[in-house]
Structures are given as structure tokens and as C-alpha cells.
Amino acid sequence: MVSLGHVLFVILLPVLLPVAADDPDDQMLSQISLPSSSRSEYDDNDVSKRVFCNGFTGCGGRHRDRSRRQERYGKRLIPVLAKRPFCNSFGCYNGKRSLSGAGPALSTPVDPSRNNKARTMARMLDAAASARHEQQQQLLQQREQRGLESRDPAASGDLSKRLFCNGYGGCRGGKRTLYSPWLERMNEVADDRSARNALCTRLGWRE
């Protein structure tokens, strides 16, 4: 006994086949899935704007969900397409499809002022890189000199590490002393017993 579904399928099959043949996305996908010899014959100027593009099924537009229908509904199965390396608002392009026919957005000449700005920026970056290299060489030389001075016991002195370095003139590779503006005065106070007693009395300390 023939079911009602089989009867409807036989009746609607001639109607669904022309609709499937007229689907622009299926035509696009069939062109992409062709071999390279047949694909090269496809005209680039007939490519319409693609709304969605990913790395698995190429570009698909508003009929992307319908083009995934099964073969029994009159739609062929979508083959696994190769990844498209470049995609913009004009569609996906690869080595088989030239960029010359992509439209005015890709064929617009480059503004000469942008080239000048790019050259100026490149020169500035090169100058900054060379200045940074020279500064690094100077720092290495200063570190080597400080290493030689620190090996001399007479030159080691009372050097101590700074507690705080910032960008306002903190550590600059010279003699790094702890509170260097006050170090000499503190040494004078430490040598003078009467001044030390007065300072301890003033601060409330007991010697």
C-alpha cells in the first residue's frame, strides 16, 4: 500500500527540482566544488556579495541553511570545501580566482600620502631601534665598569642598593647609594658624639 507521503513526494518532486536548480547559492557552491579546470572558467564579475564566510564551507548567503538540506528533498549534499584563505565583503578568493575582477573596492589606487606616511613611520622606527641599541650598549659598558669597580675593595665604599627607582631621575647607572643627599650628614652626625646625643634626645631615643 502506497502511503500519502510517497504520493506527495512524487507530486512535489518535479516542482522542487527547478527550485533547486535556480538556487544561486547552490550554483555558487557547485562552481566552487568543481575541479580547477572547470573552476577557472567561472566569471569573477558575477560574484555577488556574500553575507557569511567561514573556513569549512566557503561563503554562504541567505540560503545557507536551505542548501544544507538532504538529497531526498531535492538538494544535493554539500561537499567538504577547502578553507578559503581570504574573505571580504565581495566574497572568498583563492589562487584560482583573481582579485582583478573583485570590484572597485580592491582596484582603488593607493593614496600617495599614505606611502609617505608609511616611509616616515619606518624611518622613525629605525631611528628608535638604533637609539635603543646604542643605549643598551652604553648600559652594558657601564655595568662592566661598575663590575670592575666593585671588585676593588677600596672602591666598593658604602654603596647600597636604591629602594625606589622611577622615571623621574631615579636609578641611572651611577653610584647607587641609599638616600645619597643625606648620607654625608648622617655620617657626620654618627662621628660627632655630642651631635648624636642631641639627635637621640630630640627623637626620644636612648643611646
Curated annotation (Swiss-Prot):
Protein name as it appears in the record: ConoCAP
GO molecular function: toxin activity
Region annotated Disordered, chain positions: 131-155
A GO CC term assigned to this protein in UniProt: extracellular space
GO biological process, one term: venom-mediated reduction of heart rate
Reported impact of residue 86 to A: Complete loss of activity of conoCAP-a
Keywords in alphabetical order: Amidation, Cardiotoxin, Cleavage on pair of basic residues, Disulfide bond, Secreted, Signal, Toxin
Propeptide cleavage-removed residue intervals: 22-48, 63-82, 98-160, 177-207
Biased composition (Basic and acidic residues): 143-152
Record annotation: effect of changing residue 89 to A: No change of activity of conoCAP-a
Asparagine amide carried by residues: 94
Major place of residence: secreted
Disulfide bond sites: 53-59, 87-92, 165-171
Tissues of expression: Expressed by the venom duct.
Subcellular location: Secreted
